[in-house]
Amino acid sequence: MGYLGMPFRVGMGFDVHRFTESREEGQYIPICGIKVAHTQGIVAHSDGDVALHALTDALLGCMGEGSIGQHFPNSDPQWKNASSSYFLLEAQKKAAAKSYAILNFDVTIVCEQPKIMPHVPKMKEFLSKLLDVDVSQMNIKAVTTEKLGFLGRGEGIAAHAVLMCYRV
């Protein structure tokens, strides 16, 4: 039985983006498909949703399909300002083509600001509808770096994701 015959597969993803230098009210950061108000925006080629990028990488990794950068390179103008939801759905299609579906996933968002936890219920609702996965199959949490490093200085945001698929 080859690797693709295994009943379960696991992938891990990571992404990081820096914040814009300008600070003004009315900006937002896309996180798990939700616009979270912040005084800075995101520097990115696509919409810059670090959590969806990490999930996409985890799902692609789970299937042995490389990385988000291989499928949607930031050097390709067609992905300029592209929706991260599209990337994740394309990765899910690749999994389905190999007869796999998402069993569960865990996302950790790393930043000092903005505060993430108040938005988690909406994030879960969004991901549940997008991926057709029950909210009981997902976990989203946020941590800080205790003011250490570039994330601790408030220069950006990162996300880690672990995802498990099962053979359907």
UniProtKB/Swiss-Prot annotation:
GO terms for molecular function: 2-C-methyl-D-erythritol 2,4-cyclodiphosphate synthase activity; metal ion binding. This is 2-C-methyl-D-erythritol 2,4-cyclodiphosphate synthase. Keywords: Isoprene biosynthesis, Lyase, Metal-binding. Its cofactor is a divalent metal cation. It catalyses: 4-CDP-2-C-methyl-D-erythritol 2-phosphate = 2-C-methyl-D-erythritol 2,4-cyclic diphosphate + CMP. Binds 1 divalent metal cation per subunit. GO terms for biological process: isopentenyl diphosphate biosynthetic process, methylerythritol 4-phosphate pathway; terpenoid biosynthetic process. Pfam families: YgbB (PF02542). SUPFAM superfamilies: IpsF-like. Homotrimer. The gene is ispF. The lineage of its organism: Bacteria, Pseudomonadati, Pseudomonadota, Alphaproteobacteria, Rickettsiales. It comes from the Bacteria. 4-CDP-2-C-methyl-D-erythritol 2-phosphate binds at residues 15-17, 45-46, 72-76, 150, 153. PROSITE patterns: ISPF. It comes from Anaplasma phagocytophilum (strain HZ). A divalent metal cation binds at residues 15, 17, 53. Involved in the biosynthesis of isopentenyl diphosphate (IPP) and dimethylallyl diphosphate (DMAPP), two major building blocks of isoprenoid compounds. Catalyzes the conversion of 4-diphosphocytidyl-2-C-methyl-D-erythritol 2-phosphate (CDP-ME2P) to 2-C-methyl-D-erythritol 2,4-cyclodiphosphate (ME-CPP) with a corresponding release of cytidine 5-monophosphate (CMP). Belongs to the IspF family. Its EC number is 4.6.1.12. Pathway: Isoprenoid biosynthesis; isopentenyl diphosphate biosynthesis via DXP pathway; isopentenyl diphosphate from 1-deoxy-D-xylulose 5-phosphate: step 4/6. The record marks 45, 144 as: Transition state stabilizer. It is an enzyme of class 4 (lyase). The keyword Magnesium does not apply.
